[in-house]
């Protein structure tokens, strides 16, 4: 009987307790809910001629004629309302290019939907990242649509890009996400096995 207890103790010692999230990422269902762009070549041409080509020739961010953000953390901070602006914004994203990490892209549609301001989310055509690299290493550009931005440019974006729609979130828009942890065990992998 004592021999069987020792073997049981050895089996237990080879496993350790861990906590795994029940939902790996609460935004995975919404990650594929990008609004449709009706005339993508036109939108891409407008963005290149009106914004990107001008930004390429400007040396520093302080000289930009518009308020815009290209860093992922700055964009998230802006969309969370930290800047206190209620002006509508356009967020252009290279979501079809492999250079942009999926972890960043999964959160974008829901962040835009939950933002306190009106956000027009615009997905750009494949290989747009080649042009975008000189402006943004993350393939994202958030442009505040205030008086400094051409009204015709903004109206074309508004007309050709659908609204974000998450009908199942309308009633619970400001309720926090509840992610639970599951208590389980995993085997302890020795360093000899890893090599």
Curated annotation (Swiss-Prot):
The keyword rRNA processing applies. Required for processing of 5.8S rRNA (short form) at site A3 and for 5'- and 3'-processing of pre-tRNA. This is Ribonucleases P/MRP protein subunit POP3. Its main location: nucleus. InterPro entries: RNase_P_Pop3 (IPR013241). Keywords: Nucleus, rRNA processing, tRNA processing. GO terms for cellular component: cytosol; nucleolar ribonuclease P complex; nucleus; ribonuclease MRP complex. Pfam families: RNase_P_pop3. It comes from the Eukaryota. The keyword Kinase does not apply. Present with 1360 molecules/cell in log phase SD medium. GO terms for biological process: intronic box C/D snoRNA processing; maturation of 5.8S rRNA; nuclear-transcribed mRNA catabolic process, RNase MRP-dependent; rRNA processing; tRNA 5'-leader removal; tRNA processing. Component of nuclear RNase P and RNase MRP complexes. RNase P consists of an RNA moiety and at least 9 protein subunits including POP1, POP3, POP4, POP5, POP6, POP7, POP8, RPP1 and RPR2. RNase MRP complex consists of an RNA moiety and at least 10 protein subunits including POP1, POP3, POP4, POP5, POP6, POP7, POP8, RMP1, RPP1 and SNM1, many of which are shared with the RNase P complex. It is found in: Nucleus. Signal peptide: none annotated. Belongs to the POP3 family.
């Amino acid at each position: 009987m004592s021999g069987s207890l020792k073997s049981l103790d050895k089996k237990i010692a080879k496993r350790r307790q861990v906590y795994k999230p029940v939902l790996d990422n609460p935004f995975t269902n919404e990650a594929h809910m990008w609004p449709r762009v009706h005339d993508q070549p036109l939108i891409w041409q407008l963005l290149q001629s009106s914004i990107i080509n001008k930004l390429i020739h400007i040396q520093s961010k302080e000289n930009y004629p518009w308020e815009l953000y290209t860093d992922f953390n700055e964009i998230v901070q802006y969309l969370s309302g930290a800047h206190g602006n209620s002006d509508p914004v356009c967020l252009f994203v290279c979501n079809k290019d492999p250079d942009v990490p999926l972890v960043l892209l999964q959160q974008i549609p829901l962040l835009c939907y939950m933002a306190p301001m009106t956000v027009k989310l615009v997905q750009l055509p494949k290989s747009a990242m080649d042009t975008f690299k000189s402006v943004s290493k993350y393939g994202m550009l958030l442009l505040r649509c205030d008086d400094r931005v051409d009204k015709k440019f903004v109206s074309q974006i508004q007309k050709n890009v659908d609204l974000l729609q998450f009908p199942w979130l309308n009633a619970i828009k400001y309720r926090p996400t509840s992610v639970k942890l599951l208590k389980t065990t995993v085997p302890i992998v020795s360093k000899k096995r890893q090599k």
